[in-house]
Amino acid sequence: MKLGRFLENGREQIRNLLLNASTVSSAPSFSFVSGNESADLDSCASSIVYAYCLQRKQLGRIVVPFFNIPRKELRLRPELSYLLNLASISSDDIVFLDDIVKLPKRIFSNPIYLVDHNSLDRKDLENFNGSIAGIIDHHKDEGGSLHADPRIIEECGSCCTLVCRYFMPVIRSLYDSKVSELHQTATNLAVLALGPILIDTGNLKNEKTTDTDVKIVNDLCSFVPKDWVRDEFFDTLKEKKKSCKGFSFDDLLRRDLKQYFPDGIVVNYASVGKGLDWIKKKRLGWEDELKSFAEVQNSDLVIVGLSLSKNDEFGRQLILYKRTERGAGLADSFLKLSKQNLGLEIIEEKDNGDLSMWNQRNSAASRKKVVPLLMDSVKQVASK
């Protein structure tokens, strides 16, 4: 089955289920595949590659990947739309979060496979918590779902690397097939997977890059056309990802956002690919938008991780906004515990310290590295 047809079939099955939810007493057997709630290139590509390859093994089930964001938020990710188009995928054939949350409750007993996360943080999906059947991830192991098969959690530049390594025999068999549409599907899967792997590893040049990433990229490159140029592909995708044209600061916060609920504290952690000077110059109402965002999200604490390049040097900054006393307690504990580790240096404080901006000298510490420090800070608050 062509990749596009596979996705279209899953979307049709979900649509039919939604239209007939009140009249149909039974439903087909589903398997769901979901990335994390940031819905970045890695999560979305991983979910599609995993789902298509899983379908080759689970012929009796309908395997449905879904993007863990509302459909309307796809517009905030031009790099994702661009990559989908390169892989001959129509966004109309993608299932989104707002499709899933409307499903009858009985559907959530079907198995779900997690990629690019190893627990379900989004409350909208908590009905799936007893149904986690498999995990492939490259974040810190949270220790749950020990029964999952596979349960692959290891450090790597991109989750898509681990997904492709696991399913490489399937992808290779598709490419070697004499059926032209299967051969083409292998090429489309390879292009789709190469996007996040190259973006997350800086074209295999940054500190996140592992030997596994390099090997899988070499394998995948053998499935793409000979005139495909890796550097050009990476540069175009990077430019799409960096583009902020037409986006408000609120849009930028939602573009790569994760929510955490440690000890009942609501933390929103956004990653924005711009520095503080750019934000102050280009998004004049950013402080009001940040506070409004925190209000709408009912956040106790908002963390904004900024990344910037200056004179070809990569750097990071942090913005902390403490909306509530509980958020302030967590932020203060986090700063006390992590200030030295992250190399945090204050730039500016406002609103009696509720809004603070920091340079982060430890530029290797992305959100993936900062979140475990944040969780350790929760334990400090709880023990007081």
UniProtKB/Swiss-Prot annotation:
Disulfide bonds: none annotated. Keywords: Hydrolase, Manganese, Metal-binding. GO terms for biological process: energy reserve metabolic process; polyphosphate catabolic process. Binds 2 manganese ions per subunit. Pfam families: DHH (PF01368), DHHA2 (PF02833). It is an enzyme of class 3 (hydrolase). One of its GO terms (cellular component) is cytoplasm. Mn(2+) 1 binds at residues 40, 116. InterPro entries: DDH_dom (IPR001667), DHH_sf (IPR038763), DHHA2 (IPR004097), DHHA2_dom_sf (IPR038222). SUPFAM superfamilies: DHH phosphoesterases (SSF64182). Its cofactor is Mn(2+). Mn(2+) 2 binds at residues 42, 116, 138, 200. GO terms for molecular function: exopolyphosphatase activity; metal ion binding. Its EC number is 3.6.1.11. It catalyses: [phosphate](n) + H2O = [phosphate](n-1) + phosphate + H(+). Degradation of inorganic polyphosphates. Belongs to the PPase class C family. This is Putative exopolyphosphatase. It comes from Schizosaccharomyces pombe (strain 972 / ATCC 24843) (Fission yeast).
